[in-house]
Structure formats: structure tokens, C-alpha cells
Amino acid sequence: IGGETAEHPGLMPVDEYDVAGFAVGVVDRKDLITGENIKPGDTLIGIASSGVHSNGFSLVRSVFTITEESLNTYYDSLGKTLGEALLAPTKIYVKTMKSIKNAGVRVKGCSHITGGGFYENIPRMLPDGVRAVVKKDSYEVPPIFKMLQTDGEIEEDMMYNTFNMGIGLVLAVA
């Protein structure tokens, strides 16, 4: 089991604590998704995220001045307040994965797009010698990421290396 300890520089006083939770699942060995059978020519399917999820907030805080007023400011481009866009709950993909399995789709690999964005997470599911080609123009990047990129003058590569850019889960299928 892997994991990390979240750091909140400049956000939390030394004497405060961050409370987090986790879940552990059980799967039959025959249903394990290992990525070992991914081959060139397989298809990658991106499943939408619900927003920023919980990654890249140090960069978010460097782009936006976070105050009660700024978080409560409504933006037409977002269709909501900045706070609502940034704090949208992280999507959990259990129901999505169950539906895909029940539809008979053979998932060969699965990559949760977290810290490290596309560039670090997608390769983790690929066997040696296999690489992914992501067609960035095949979906619409959500407005919160466009706003972050524009307001922060952030290069596209940095955006895809930090954020999920609207794709929270990538599946490799035959």
C-alpha cells in the first residue's frame, strides 16, 4: 500500500491537524487490473473528473489570492463561485468501474490521475515498451483549468503535469 503525507505550507498553523480518510478494497485475483496485458493499439478512455480533486492546491494558491471574498465571487465562465469550483468533491469511481465491468468491457489498465497529472500517472499502468498517445483535443478542458492556466500564465505541459485537466481516471481497453 502506497501513500503520502499531505503538506500544507503557509495554510495551516503548526498546532492544527488535517484529518483524512481512506478505503481499502478486496478483489478476486481473476479480477485484478494489473496493466501487464496492455499492448500497442489498445485504446485509452478518459473518465471525467469532478474538478481539481485534491491535487495542485499549492499552485492554485499561488495563482489566486484566496480570501472569503474571492472564494464567494461568481464567475460566468465557471457557472459558479471560485470556491465551489475549487472545492467540488473528488469523484470516486467505484460506480463507474462497476458499470463498465457489468457492461462486459475488459479493462486492461487503470490510472487515477492525481499528483503528477497525465505525465506521471498514465505511464505507471503501462508495461515496458508501451507508450500512451493522449489526444488532448478529444475532450473539452473544464473552465476551472482554463482559468488557472490563463490567470497563472502556466505552460500547458505544467498544467498536464500538475492537474487532471478534467480527466480523473484513464482506462486502457482492448
Per-range role (PLM):
Residues 25-27, 42-44, 48-53, 61-64, ...:
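Glycine-rich beta-alpha junction loops
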Residues 38-84:
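Acidic, glycine-rich loop-and-beta core segments that form the ion-binding/anion-interacting portion
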Residues 12-19, 70-71, 76-87, 91-174:
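Glycine-/charge-enriched secondary-structure boundary and capping motifs
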Residues 1-58:
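Glycine-rich anion-binding loops of enzyme active sites
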